[in-house]
């Protein structure tokens, strides 16, 4: 139901928007992203994983774009009894922009993300020792907001917050900064 409403909103937006001067066309880019993993089941602090994300997409006009992303984690983080490592991630997204000036474009973004990671926990509960080593896939609808700033006609930078996964007692989000090049 939510997906159908989202697709309808995108179609209406695409049909109502006119072309503009903002580097319409294909682009590629890369971001440094600090992924944040929260797991309420283990009552641990937020785990932070450094990662690199590659982006490629197409800006139809000033207001509408689509992009795909793929990335991988560089390391793992441990706090208390929990350890998390992100192996890889990929997804597809629709981006809606609202230009403030010729070079400043805040946006919202939504789509679907798949990730593979490993969650490890080791501890003791009521005198019983336990150990969890779970390599698993995370997939969910994703959304976020950010700002693109054009530095030149073909080079831009961006800052973004994204919620990639939020189910049950687990959440994966990310704050990123990066560069992109239009061609």
Per-region residue spans from a language model:
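Residues that define the transmembrane beta-barrel architecture of outer-membrane proteins
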Residues: 48-52, 84-90, 137-143, 171-175
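Residues on the lipid-exposed face of transmembrane beta-strands in outer-membrane beta-barrel proteins
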Residues: 54-58, 92-98, 110, 145-149, ...
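Cleavable N-terminal export/targeting peptides
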Residues: 1-25
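Predominantly the C-terminal beta-signal and adjacent terminal strand-loop region
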Residues: 75-76, 139, 143, 148-183
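Short glycine/proline- and aromatic-enriched beta-strand/turn motifs that initiate or cap beta-hairpins
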Residues: 20-74, 96, 114-116
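Outer-membrane beta-barrel translocator domains and adjoining extracellular loop/strand segments
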Residues: 38-47, 76-84, 118-131, 169-175
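Repeated loop/turn-to-beta-strand initiation elements of outer-membrane beta-barrel proteins
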Residues: 26-28, 63-68, 102-106, 149-159
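Outer-membrane beta-barrel proteins
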Residues: 16-19, 36, 60-62, 95-102, ...
């Amino acid at each position: 139901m939510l997906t159908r409403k989202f697709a309808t909103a995108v179609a209406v937006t695409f049909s109502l928007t006119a072309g503009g001067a903002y580097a319409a066309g294909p682009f590629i880019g890369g971001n440094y992203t600090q992924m944040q993993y929260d797991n309420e089941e283990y009552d641990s602090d937020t785990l932070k994983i450094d990662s690199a994300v590659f982006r490629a997409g197409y800006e139809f006009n000033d207001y509408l774009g689509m992009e795909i992303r793929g990335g991988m984690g560089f390391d793992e983080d441990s706090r208390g009894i929990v350890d998390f490592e992100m192996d890889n991630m990929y997804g597809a997204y629709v981006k809606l922009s609202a230009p403030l000036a010729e070079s400043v474009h805040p946006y919202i973004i939504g789509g679907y993300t798949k990730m593979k990671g490993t969650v490890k926990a080791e501890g003791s509960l009521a005198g019983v020792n336990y150990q969890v080593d779970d390599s698993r896939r995370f997939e969910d609808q994703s959304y976020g907001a950010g700002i693109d700033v054009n530095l030149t006609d073909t080079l831009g930078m961006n800052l973004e917050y994204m919620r990639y996964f939020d189910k049950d007692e687990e959440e994966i989000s990310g704050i990123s900064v990066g560069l992109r090049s239009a061609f």
